[in-house]
Amino acid sequence: MFREALTYDDVLLVPQHSDIESRKEVNIGNWLDESRGLWFNLPIIASPMDTVCGTEMAIEIGKMGGLGIVHRYNTIEKQCEMADQIVEQIGSEKFGCAIGITDDYLERATALV
């Protein structure tokens, strides 16, 4: 049912000689969801913290091939405005929005969809 996933503790990089002549030859892309065709060239997800991922960060990391998760530490209306700005710039499949688990999570999720 669940795909195998790796965390930082599962990976060890050992320095060694390489025949690669340019870092442009390396492909670090990966599927986020192969069944939906969600491929990311940059396998980095920006944390949904107000000091990390707002509108600008979500747009820029999306342009580079990563994924930004917009924080929820504002009103539902403001988060929807942020989402609209991001969709205008990079489309709807290159970012996400945190909704939390407290009082307004259902209203927030409904408004964002």
What residue ranges belong to the model's regions?
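Alpha/beta enzyme core
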Residues: 2-5, 11, 53-113
